[in-house]
């Protein structure tokens, strides 16, 4: 099958490589970012514990770094 594709379009390997490179780059840009530390849970609904979260970055980058201050309500 690969030989037929190559015969039909001698540039198919270049096209396939370009497509793979594009998909890899796209996935790096739009994939979900995963933190390097553990997750954080805030509050406890059953116990009625709530928190006010301030200083959280809401920038356009998913990796915006911020300093957070936590205070109980």
Swiss-Prot record:
Domain of life from the UniProt record: Bacteria
Protein name (Swiss-Prot/TrEMBL): Uncharacterized protein HI_1176
